[in-house]
Amino acid sequence: GRAYAKGGGSIDVKGRGNSGRMHMKDADGKTVGNPFGYGVVSGQPGTETVPQEMRRNMPGEGYPMPDGTYKVHSFDKHGPLGASLRGLGDWSAYIGSGDGNIGKRSGMMIHSDIDPYGTLGCIGVDLGGKPGTRAEKGFLKAWSMSNPETISVDFGAPTGGMDGNSMRSETSDNSIAKMSSNQSGSKPTPPS
């Protein structure tokens, strides 16, 4: 089954558009890790003004994560992954239910923001742009102290609906094939 943290800590992301700062707290609400927080990005450059509903329900566009409070689970120090998953770095955890499901999107995670800058909608943490940095080692130590159970995301993005004219039509599932993360030896799937 899934490894949901029990009685764990929390992650708080605050920012504007699609970037900001993240702080971690332990189960007692005490800040752990860098007291100034960690820089984060979500989505591709140029997606800062995408409204909440589109962030929630438009997979495959590289939009930022929608604002909200979600479960954090299935943390994995998987080491380097190949090809399209290289950008995850050496560790990741799912955000949302199941395999990182938020609205109509899946594969939503928190991971190191490996260069180039930006993610497909995950929360990418700025720890130097490559795996194995001192910043990353400190972050992972703080992660284990926090044992985060929830993440609260607030990019202050505009609310409002979708402008149907400029959007391509979607199939019932145009996301990358989903794979269950609770199979032994499975790798995370790229976000959509």
Question: Which residues make up each language-model segment?
Answer:
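Exported/periplasmic cell-wall-interacting domains
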Residues: 76-188
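Secretion-targeting segments and adjacent low-complexity export tracts
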Residues: 1-8, 181, 187-192
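Gly/Pro-biased beta-strand-loop elements
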Residues: 1-108
